[in-house]
C-alpha cells in the first residue's frame, strides 16, 4: 500500500526548510568590531532557533559588508530550494546603496528584523564604542529606506529577541514563507472539470501559474478509475484493517457486514488516488460529482484521508481552494488542529446567537478533530453512483479562520474571516457528514455582508492551526489582495477598502 510519506511533493514537515540569517555592517569599524558583530548576530540567530515559536531553522551567514557579497548571497538563496526566505538585520550602520543589487536580485521572502544585541542600555558604562557597535536603530532605518525606495515587499518585526511576541511574529512569517514555497512548486491534478454553470470555481489557470507558481492540469477521471480498479487485493486488505484500527467503523461496513464491499471499494479509491498523485508528483487535486466516469463512488473517505496526510483538495473542480488547503497544511505543519476544505452550508439565525454550519457532501478533513471519526455509508442523492463511504465527526471547538480565493478578472483576491468554532447546540443524528459550527467575527450580520460584498467564494479552507496573521503574511509574500473580516470590521469601512483596492490594483497593474 502506498504510504503517506512516499510522495516527496506531499511533505508538510517544516524541517525540510531553512531561512538564512543575514547581518549587515561595513568595514569602516575595523576587524575587532566585525568580530563582535558576527558573534552577537550568531547569538541572536541561536536565541530564535531555541524558541519553540520559530519552526524553521535560521542558518547564520557571515556578516555582509560589501555589495558583491550581498548580491552573491541573494543569488545563492534564490538557487537553493530548501531556503524559503531570508531574515536581515543591520547590527551596525550598513550603507544601503550596498544592498541595492542584492535586494533587486532577491526572489525569496524577506523579513526585516529590527532588534539589537542588548535589551537594556548599560547606563553607567555606555560610551561611544558601544554606540558604534550597537546602532541598529540607525542602520535599520537606512535599510528600511532602501527597501521602500526599491518597493521590496517584506515583513518588519521589531523588538528584542527575548520578547515572546518577536519570536511569534518571526514564526508566523516563516510559516507563511513555507506555504509560499509549497505553492510555488505545487502540481495540482484535476480529475474532470468544474461543476457545470458554477461561476466562482472558475479561474485563469495560466495566470495562477504566473502569480503563484502552481501548475494546474486535468486528467480524465477514467484514468483514475483504471488506477482504482487495478489496486491489489492484498493492499486493500491492509488498508481496510487500518480503517478498523483507526476509526469507529459501523458494523455493516466491517468484514462480514452487508456493506463491507463498499468499504473495500473506498479503499481501492484511496489506493488509486495515492498512486496516481504520486506518479504525477502532485500534492493537490480536485474531483467533481458530475464527472465520475467508471468510478462506482464519489471519492469520500479517500479524499478525507489524503487531506489528513497533507494533500490540498477542492470539490467540484475548485482548484483555487485546493491551493489554499495545501498551503494551509504546510503552514500549520507541526501545530495542533487541522485544515480542511469547507463550505458555508446553512445558518442558525437565533438573534444574538447566530452561527454558521459548515460542511460538504463528504470531503471534510479529520484533522479538525482529536476524536475518533465514525466511518459510515449513506446515499448521496446526486452523482448517480453507489452510496459513498465517509468519515463523520464534529470539528473541535476553538479559534479558527476561513479563507477563500477568488478570480476577480484583473487579480486574485483572498478573503479571510476570523471565527470561533463552537460545539454543536444539539446533536445532528440525521446529518451523515463531517461538519463544523462557528461564530464569525465581528458578528454574523457584518461577517456575511462583508463576505458577500467582497464576492468571496462559498468554498474555503478552514484552519484551526494558524491564524489570520499567517495568511496576512502569505498574501503579502504572494503580492495578492487580502480582505480581512475580524473583530474590528465595519461594513462602512470595508466598502471603502474595496474601493481603495480597486483603484490601487488598477494603477499598480499599469506600473
UniProtKB/Swiss-Prot annotation:
Cofactor(s), by name: Mn(2+)
One Pfam family linked to the record: AraA_N
GO CC annotations on file: cytosol
Residue ranges of the TM segments: none
Keyword Manganese: yes
Described function: Catalyzes the conversion of L-arabinose to L-ribulose.
Biological source species: Paenarthrobacter aurescens (strain TC1)
Record family assignment: Belongs to the arabinose isomerase family.
Record-level GO BP terms: L-arabinose catabolic process to xylulose 5-phosphate
Protein name: L-arabinose isomerase
UniProt xrefs under SUPFAM superfamilies: FucI/AraA C-terminal domain-like, FucI/AraA N-terminal and middle domains
Single GO MF annotation: L-arabinose isomerase activity
Catalytic activity field: beta-L-arabinopyranose = L-ribulose
Keywords: Arabinose catabolism, Carbohydrate metabolism, Isomerase, Manganese, Metal-binding
EC number, UniProt record: 5.3.1.4
Entry annotated with the keyword Isomerase: yes
NCBIfam families the record matches: PRK02929.1
Amino acid at each position: 500500500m502506498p504510504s503517506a510519506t512516499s510522495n516527496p511533493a506531499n511533505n508538510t514537515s517544516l524541517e525540510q526548510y531553512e531561512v538564512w540569517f543575514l547581518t549587515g555592517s561595513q568595514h569602516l569599524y575595523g576587524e575587532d568590531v566585525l568580530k563582535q558583530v558576527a558573534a552577537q548576530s550568531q547569538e541572536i540567530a541561536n536565541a530564535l532557533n531555541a524558541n519553540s515559536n520559530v519552526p524553521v531553522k535560521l542558518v547564520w551567514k557571515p556578516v555582509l559588508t560589501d555589495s558583491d557579497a550581498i548580491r552573491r548571497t541573494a543569488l545563492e538563496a534564490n538557487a537553493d530550494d530548501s531556503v524559503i526566505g531570508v531574515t536581515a538585520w543591520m547590527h551596525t550602520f550598513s550603507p544601503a546603496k550596498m544592498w541595492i543589487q542584492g535586494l533587486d536580485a532577491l526572489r525569496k521572502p524577506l523579513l526585516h528584523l529590527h532588534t539589537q544585541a542588548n535589551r537594556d542600555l548599560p547606563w553607567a558604562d555606555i560610551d561611544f564604542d558601544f554606540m558604534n557597535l550597537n546602532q541598529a536603530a540607525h542602520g535599520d532605518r537606512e535599510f528600511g529606506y532602501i527597501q521602500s525606495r526599491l518597493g521590496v515587499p517584506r515583513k518588519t518585526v521589531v523588538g528584542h529577541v527575548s520578547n515572546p511576541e518577536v519570536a511569534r511574529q518571526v514564526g508566523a512569517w516563516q510559516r507563511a514563507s513555507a506555504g509560499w514555497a509549497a505553492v510555488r512548486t505545487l502540481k495540482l491534478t484535476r480529475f474532470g472539470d468544474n461543476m457545470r454553470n458554477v461561476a466562482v470555481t472558475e479561474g485563469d489557470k495560466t495566470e495562477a501559474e504566473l502569480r503563484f507558481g502552481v501548475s494546474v492540469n486535468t486528467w480524465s477521471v477514467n484514468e483514475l478509475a483504471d488506477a482504482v480498479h487495478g489496486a491489489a487485493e492484498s493492499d486493500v486488505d491492509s488498508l481496510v484493517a487500518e480503517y478498523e484500527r483507526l476509526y469507529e467503523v459501523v458494523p455493516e461496513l466491517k468484514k462480514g457486514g452487508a456493506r463491507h464491499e463498499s468499504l473495500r471499494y473506498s479503499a481501492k479509491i484511496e489506493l488509486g488516488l495515492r498512486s496516481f498523485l504520486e506518479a504525477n508528483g502532485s500534492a493537490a487535486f480536485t474531483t467533481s460529482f458530475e464527472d465520475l466516469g467508471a468510478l462506482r463512488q464519489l471519492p469520500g473517505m479517500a479524499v478525507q484521508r489524503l487531506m489528513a496526510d497533507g494533500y490540498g483538495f477542492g470539490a467540484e473542480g475548485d482548484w483555487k481552494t485546493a491551493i489554499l488547503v495545501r498551503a494551509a497544511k504546510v503552514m500549520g505543519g507541526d501545530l495542533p488542529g487541522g485544515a480542511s476544505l469547507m463550505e458555508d452550508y446553512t445558518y442558525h439565525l437565533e438573534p444574538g446567537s447566530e452561527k454558521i454550519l459548515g460542511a460538504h457532501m463528504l470531503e471534510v478533513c479529520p484533522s479538525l478533530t482529536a476524536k475518533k471519526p465514525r466511518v459510515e455509508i449513506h446515499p448521496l442523492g446526486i452523482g448517480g453512483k453507489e452510496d459513498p463511504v465517509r468519515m463523520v465527526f464534529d470539528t473541535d471547538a476553538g479559534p479558527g479562520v476561513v479563507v477563500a480565493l477568488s478570480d476577480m478578472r484583473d487579480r486574485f483576491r483572498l478573503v479571510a474571516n476570523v471565527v470561533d468554532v463552537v460545539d454543536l447546540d444539539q446533536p445532528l443524528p440525521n446529518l451523515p457528514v463531517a461538519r463544523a459550527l462557528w461564530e464569525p467575527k465581528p458578528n454574523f450580520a457584518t461577517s456575511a455582508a462583508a463576505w458577500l460584498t467582497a464576492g468571496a467564494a462559498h468554498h474555503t479552507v478552514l484552519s484551526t492551526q494558524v491564524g489570520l496573521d499567517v495568511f496576512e503574511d502569505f498574501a503579502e509574500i504572494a503580492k495578492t489582495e487580502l480582505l480581512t473580516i475580524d473583530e474590528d470590521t465595519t461594513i462602512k469601512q470595508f466598502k471603502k477598502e474595496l474601493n481603495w483596492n480597486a483603484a490601487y490594483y488598477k494603477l499598480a497593474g499599469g506600473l
